[in-house]
Amino acid sequence: MGTTAYPHRERQRVLLTGLLPDISTDPAIETATDSTEAGRSGTIVAPVGIRPPLLAAVATRAATPLVVLTATGRDAETLTNALASWIPGVAMLPAWETLPHERLSPQVDTMARRIAVLRRLVH
């Protein structure tokens, strides 16, 4: 039996922004946000499931843009999608599609997306 596609249904994002004030009052979340806000530590180690709301809490209290590093492009995409449910304005800096020693240039749209994200960080 095959699967049925529903082209008329768009994938809708569930917004969790209403939960953020309650999550932000958790003592562990407060400790992490206070630590990063005071400049004591820029490293947060947390289980995968709590990372999006934790980072959203840190980002909402930060006076500057929050930059998060991930191990892989796939991790970055997953985290970007999850964070977008918690806070607006999430962007991902796409990876170059070529290796430094290759004579190929990245796609124009990749370069444009990278420039757009870098511009947002500066302005």
Kindly give the residue locations of the regions a language model identified.
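ASCE RecA-like P-loop NTPase motor cores
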Residues: 1-123
